[in-house]
Structures are given as C-alpha cells and as structure tokens.
Amino acid sequence: MSQPFLPYGRQHVTEADMAAVRRVLEGDYLTTGPEVPAFEADFAAAVAAPHAVACNSATAALHLALDALGVSGGDVCIAPSITFLATANAARYCGADVGFADVDPETGLMTPDTLKAALKRA
C-alpha cells in the first residue's frame, strides 16, 4: 500500500464524549436507559432513515443486518481477504458459507474483478 498504515486503534475522545459517559454511569441505567433511544433517533435522523437499532458491537450489527436480509443456509457471502473476523463470522452465524476475495494492494479493498473471481470459486 502506498498510504501510511491506518491508525486502527487510535481514538478521538472529546470532553463532550467524556461528559456523556459520566452522565450515563452516574445515572440509574447503563444499557436500557433513555440514552439508547435518543441515540437511535439521532442516528436515524442523521442518515435519513425511518429507524435505527443500536447494537453492542459491529459484530452484532453485522449479524443483525444479514439476518434482516434473510441470509441463511445455502447462501454465500463474500468478504475481503483482509478484514476483521466478525465480517465472516456474521455470515456463518446465519448459516451461510463464506468466500474471500483478494484485495487491491494499493487500496486494501476488494474490487469488482476480485469479487467476480471469488463468486466463481464459491
């Protein structure tokens, strides 16, 4: 890759973020309080969607999305060969088989051509 490595673990946390976390931790609820539906409503509005569902992790969100799409046994999902394990696991949780597509060495992403090749192998 010609670009510097993406600082995957680096976080950008503001004072407003810290105050929001303190407010939740000092409140009566951690996971079922008013912050969750407020976040879902704000997120839905930000992406112009009628609804949004907060998940505890991207793994859970991928699993939920594939399940909502009806992915199940007999289906094949293609993931890039460079990815976090949850990408493939979410498809397996739904019963689908998983294939992997090579990635472009410059971008680190699968391309239409590598996707086509992976689909032929599937």
For each predicted feature, which ranges?
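PLP-dependent aminotransferase-like
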Residues: 67-122
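Conserved PLP-binding active-site segment in aminotransferase class I/II-type PLP enzymes
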Residues: 1-68, 72, 94, 116
